[in-house]
Amino acid sequence: MTELTNADLLTAIVTPFTDEGTIDYPALDQLTEHLLQAGNNGFVVGGTTGETPTLSHDEKIELYTHFGRLIAGRVPVIAGTGSNNTAETIAFTNEVAQIEGIDYALVVVPPYNKPNQRGMLAHFTAVADAVELPLIIYNIPGRTGVKMETSTVLTLAEHPNIAGIKQCASLEEFQTLVENRPAGFAVYTGEDAQALTTKVLGGDGVISVAAHNYAPQMRAMYDALSAGNYQVAAKLQRWLTPRMAALFMFPSPSPVKAVLAAQGLATDHCRLPICDLTAEEKEQLATALGLPSDALAGQLPTDLGEGLTND
């Protein structure tokens, strides 16, 4: 098992699709190696950005098996296994636990059902008690319709098979988690714009969408922070923040995929109900990213911040 100990920049990786709509494994391999070289030191596969609701059970198993072999222990891999059915989550997580190279299971707060805090506590306790993989809680109220309160997270953090959380909430809540977590419980932000602040507060890092397109700058930001170059780190975060926001101006992951396509790293295809960006939307996105309006119709470099002054 590859642990999260030194993993601070993890990408919630997209699932590339071919023109025919199947998973594009050569593109996934190319993108993964690019991200590793750019400074990523962990991945979530089959998460929100991976369009997991549109993947069949067999596709997920095939995807996770392929990805585990590809990474081969170089960095930790977290696979999405959660659902709003506790028994189904247990069964699928135990199936994924048999896949070599998968280190953790990402289990989302159950969407749609809208359980209360007692229900969330019971759900995660039941899953953690019954599965082999250590769990990462995924608290993303904007998508699930309910929020796991900090007190509930801290109760679950004491469970020996719950290893951490991907938290999409306020900085105040993040700070409370960091201050009160038990030893060994990892706290990651799922909000790119919080990437620097959460590290300053003592968190473990970010599970990122923007790292697909801005990994060198995000790695440089964290390296600057570690070296005590706070002005450099802050400057990079200020440069990144509007670009991070732009990557969510249309339903994710369509903006990220549009940029990856222009970089030659993957196609821009999404699965319905997420649509590929139109030509007009690509122009709007390019402008918001600080690029010429026609930039996404051409070829972009793989380093979008090349030449950025950061000293």
Curated annotation (Swiss-Prot):
Binding site for pyruvate: T49, I207
Reactions mediated catalytically: L-aspartate 4-semialdehyde + pyruvate = (2S,4S)-4-hydroxy-2,3,4,5-tetrahydrodipicolinate + H2O + H(+)
InterPro entries: Aldolase_TIM (IPR013785), DapA (IPR005263), DapA-like (IPR002220), Schiff_base-form_aldolases_AS (IPR020625)
Enzyme class name: lyase
Pathway stated in the Swiss-Prot or TrEMBL entry: Amino-acid biosynthesis; L-lysine biosynthesis via DAP pathway; (S)-tetrahydrodipicolinate from L-aspartate: step 3/4
GO cellular component annotations of the record: cytosol
EC numbers: 4.3.3.7
SUPFAM superfamilies for this protein: Aldolase
Active-site residues from the entry: Y138, K166
Localization per record: Cytoplasm
Gene3D superfamilies per record: Aldolase class I
GO BP, sorted A to Z: diaminopimelate biosynthetic process; lysine biosynthetic process via diaminopimelate
Pfam families reported in the protein's UniProt record: DHDPS
Primary localization class, coarse: cytoplasm
A molecular function GO annotation: 4-hydroxy-tetrahydrodipicolinate synthase activity
Entry keywords, A to Z: Amino-acid biosynthesis, Cytoplasm, Diaminopimelate biosynthesis, Lyase, Lysine biosynthesis, Schiff base
Residues the UniProt record annotates as site (Part of a proton relay during catalysis): T48, Y112
Function: Catalyzes the condensation of (S)-aspartate-beta-semialdehyde [(S)-ASA] and pyruvate to 4-hydroxy-tetrahydrodipicolinate (HTPA).
Quaternary organization: Homotetramer; dimer of dimers.
Similarity comment: family membership: Belongs to the DapA family.
Protein name: 4-hydroxy-tetrahydrodipicolinate synthase
Organism: Limosilactobacillus fermentum (strain NBRC 3956 / LMG 18251) (Lactobacillus fermentum)
Lineage, highest ranks first: Bacteria, Bacillati, Bacillota, Bacilli, Lactobacillales
